[in-house]
C-alpha cells in the first residue's frame, strides 16, 4: 500500500544514517521497485564515509564484485583522516581514561579543571574530539562515536557553537546502537535544551519537528515509550502544535500508541478531538478506524479499517513490531464499544464485527472474562454474551482529571511566557527612539 507509506516523508526529518534502517526495511517489502530503492540507498550512502556499505550496495545492484579505484582511493583517505584525528585526541582521551573512575568525572567543572591542571587541556582538544566523533559517526562507527560525544557533553559549555550538534549526534548514535535507555535520556536532554533555548519561533518549530520524528524511534522501542509518546505528543501544547502545523502524519504513531496502551484509555477522548481537527490534512486507516468506532459508531466500517490497519502497520518500520498487539487491542476496543450499546449480544454477531470465526470469538471472550478484564457471562446454549456494568475506576477518573489540568496549566504557562517575551521586546524597541 504505497499510498499509505510514510517513509519518504519521515526520511525528510531524519539524519541520513537514521534513514538506512527504514530503507533496508522497505527492501524486504514489495511496495517499491527494488532496483530504484537500492539505487537510492547507494546515492545516500555515497554521501557518507561508509565505504564497505557502499561496496555491499553496489554488489546488490550487480554493478561490480571488485572495489573501483575511486572507492579504493577514498577508503585510503578516510583511514588516513581517521588516524590523524585519533592522534590529535589521543593524549586527552588517555587522561580521560585515568580520570573516569574518579570523583572528578561526576562533576563537569571539576573534571575540566583536572584536565586543565594535570593534562594541559586546551580548547583545541575539544574541537578535535568533536571532529573525531563526527567523523566516526560518518564512518558508521556509532559505538565509538558515542564515547567522544559523551566527552564533549561533559566538557562543552551549553553556549558552545557545537553543543546542539553534539546533542543531536549523541541521540542519533544511541538510536543506531539500540541503546534505548541512554537514547531516552539524550532525548529528554535535547528536548529540554530546545524548549529553553532562545530560538526564533520558526527555528523552534523546526527543531521540535525533527525531534518528534527522531523520538518515535525511541518511544516504540523503550518500555516506557508508550506513555511518554502520549505525554509529549498529545499533552505538551508546543509539540502538539508542531504536529498539527508541520507533520500531521505523526498522528498515525500517536493513535497507535493510544490503541496499544490499555492503561491510557482516558487519552482517547483528547486523541479523537485532534484526529477530527486534522482529518482535512491527514487521514489513514488507523485514524479512520478510531473515527469509525468512536465518532460514527460504524462497526462495519471499523471492521474493514482494522483489516487495512494490519497492512499499513506491517509495512511501517516504526510500528511493525506492534502489529499483533494492535490487532488484539483494536478488537477489544470494538468489543467494548459494541457492548456499551448492546447488553445482550450473539457470539456470531461479535465474530463478524471482530473478523473472527464464532468458535475463535467465543474463546477470545472466555479469556477476557477469565483474566478479569471483562464483566460478562456467556450463555453457551443460546450463543449469547450478557454484559454486566463496567463503571470507570476512580484511578482512571483521577488520571483523566490530572491530564486535563496538566494540559491547561502548560497552555497557560506558554501564553504567559509569550506575553512576557512580547512585553520585553516592546520595552527594548522603545529604546531605539532615545
Curated annotation (Swiss-Prot):
InterPro entries: eIF3e (IPR016650), eIF3e_N (IPR019010), PCI_dom (IPR000717), WH_DNA-bd_sf (IPR036390). SMART domains: eIF3_N, PINT. GO terms for biological process: formation of cytoplasmic translation initiation complex. Keywords: Cytoplasm, Initiation factor, Protein biosynthesis. The keyword Mitochondrion does not apply. Residues 219-392 form the PCI domain. It is found in: Cytoplasm. The keyword Cytoplasm applies. One of its GO terms (molecular function) is translation initiation factor activity. Pfam families: eIF3_N (PF09440), PCI (PF01399). Its main location: cytoplasm. It comes from the Eukaryota. SUPFAM superfamilies: Winged helix' DNA-binding domain (SSF46785). One of its GO terms (cellular component) is eukaryotic 43S preinitiation complex. Belongs to the eIF-3 subunit E family. Component of the eukaryotic translation initiation factor 3 (eIF-3) complex, which is involved in protein synthesis of a specialized repertoire of mRNAs and, together with other initiation factors, stimulates binding of mRNA and methionyl-tRNAi to the 40S ribosome. The eIF-3 complex specifically targets and initiates translation of a subset of mRNAs involved in cell proliferation. Component of the eukaryotic translation initiation factor 3 (eIF-3) complex. The eIF-3 complex interacts with pix. Interacts with mxt. This is Eukaryotic translation initiation factor 3 subunit E.
